[in-house]
Swiss-Prot record:
One of its GO terms (biological process) is cytoplasmic translation. It comes from Acidovorax ebreus (strain TPSY) (Diaphorobacter sp. (strain TPSY)). Part of the 50S ribosomal subunit. This is Large ribosomal subunit protein uL6. This protein binds to the 23S rRNA, and is important in its secondary structure. It is located near the subunit interface in the base of the L7/L12 stalk, and near the tRNA binding site of the peptidyltransferase center. GO terms for molecular function: rRNA binding; structural constituent of ribosome. Keywords: Ribonucleoprotein, Ribosomal protein, RNA-binding, rRNA-binding. InterPro entries: Ribosomal_uL6-like, Ribosomal_uL6-like_a/b-dom_sf, Ribosomal_uL6_a/b-dom, Ribosomal_uL6_bac-type, Ribosomal_uL6_CS. Belongs to the universal ribosomal protein uL6 family. Signal peptide: none annotated.
């Protein structure tokens, strides 16, 4: 059995988990998240802990028990604490400005690049070269950060572009004559 799937998910105070036939929904201060129930995994709630059991001994069911456990854990952490990704803009004249649920980027193109934030996601720019994306859904936060980074990824010679705050970009040496 999956080692991840064996460990239960503890439910903190202020988080409500409901398990229906086809859906698991988690409700908390950060909002409501839901996940489609997998037929290969049986989810049960015992005294504030969620346990995940594969319905049979197949390899696929064992793998799915770990996957479903981690997805539900991400939902519980998301509605209680939330997730955030930080991006940094490096380059002369590179700027970001957040207004409401829109993000405007001036990153060296002849036109500004605009992003519309999905529901449940907030974006902030503490400085013009920093972007902070926050939300309850880990997948959406990471996907949005990756899409913003993909507009102008860091180039290998000077390191200019958009990178994650904790990302290390290796700088190549220029060609010598």
């Amino acid at each position: 059995m999956s080692r991840v799937g064996k460990s239960p998910v503890s439910i903190p105070a202020g988080v409500d988990v409901s398990i229906k036939d086809d859906q698991i929904s988690v409700k908390g201060a950060g909002g409501v998240l839901s996940l489609a129930q997998n037929a290969l995994v049986k989810v049960s709630n015992n005294e504030g802990k969620l346990s995940f059991e594969p319905v049979n001994d197949s390899r696929e069911a064992n793998a799915m028990s770990g996957t479903v456990r981690q997805l539900v854990n991400n939902m519980v952490v998301g509605v209680s604490k939330g997730f955030e990704k930080k991006l940094t803009l490096i380059g002369v004249g590179f700027k970001a400005a957040a207004s409401g649920n829109k993000l405007n980027l001036a990153i060296g193109f002849s036109h500004p690049v605009n992003f519309e934030m999905p529901t449940g996601i907030t974006v902030a720019t503490p400085t013009p070269t920093e972007i902070v994306i926050k939300g309850a859904d880990r997948q959406v936060v990471g996907q949005l950060a990756a899409e913003i980074r993909a507009v102008r990824p860091p180039e290998p010679y000077k390191g200019k572009g958009i990178r994650y705050a904790d990302e290390k970009v290796t700088i190549k040496e220029t060609k010598k004559k």
